[in-house]
Amino acid sequence: MPKASEVKKNTAIEFNNNVYLIRDIERSVPQGRSGGSLYRMRMYDVATGSKLDHTFKADEMINLADLSRHEVSFSYIDGDEYVFMDIADYTPYHFNKDSIADEILFINEETQGLQVLTVDGTPVAIELPANVELVIVETDPSIKGASASARTKPAILSTGLSVQVPEYIANGEKIKINTAEHKFMSRADSK
């Protein structure tokens, strides 16, 4: 059993006789109090989808649930459901559009390194790779010779995600995006 300070995002835990998936963790250090840090965790019940915010002390022990990961690829959209296919055994995993709204902004047919997290065989979340490559569909014209400048401009990508990019980037270019920070990393390697 890990301590609360050792638990990471997208971990499944058992809490109050239910299984929750941790979606966000905020660390705080109370002023004027002896003791350690506090970890406020935003969790979602795997069975019902209901949200729970709970604060744990850093040294509080947490029970982990049986969580497994399956490498998948995005397959197709069926109404409000997004369907992902297991790369190893072709098992389809269905997700409601609302339950993966944040992840959808980084996913297209070419996205590699996606994983479905399952608890007791039930899909509960999509885990994104550290970075993805997406195409810019709308941005201001590029400025020649602006590579030495640190100024940025907004760009809309093929999935609808909006990020800040350097001024020398143009429409139609494929770029790498950091999925955790929602930030431009570099131009994608041309193959």
Swiss-Prot record:
Membrane spanning residue stretches: none
GO BP annotations listed: peptide biosynthetic process
Molecular functions (GO terms): translation elongation factor activity
Family in the record: Belongs to the elongation factor P family.
Superkingdom as given in the UniProt entry: Bacteria
Protein name: Elongation factor P-like protein
Pfam family, one: EFP_N
Alphabetized InterPro entries for the sequence: Elong-fact-P_C, NA-bd_OB-fold, Rib_uL2_dom2, Transl_elong_fac_P/YeiP, Transl_elong_KOW-like, Transl_elong_p-like_YeiP, Transl_elong_P/YeiP_cen, Transl_elong_P/YeiP_CS
Lineage, top ranks: Bacteria, Pseudomonadati, Pseudomonadota, Gammaproteobacteria, Alteromonadales
Record Gene3D superfamilies: 2.30.30.30, Nucleic acid-binding proteins
GO cellular component, one term: cytoplasm
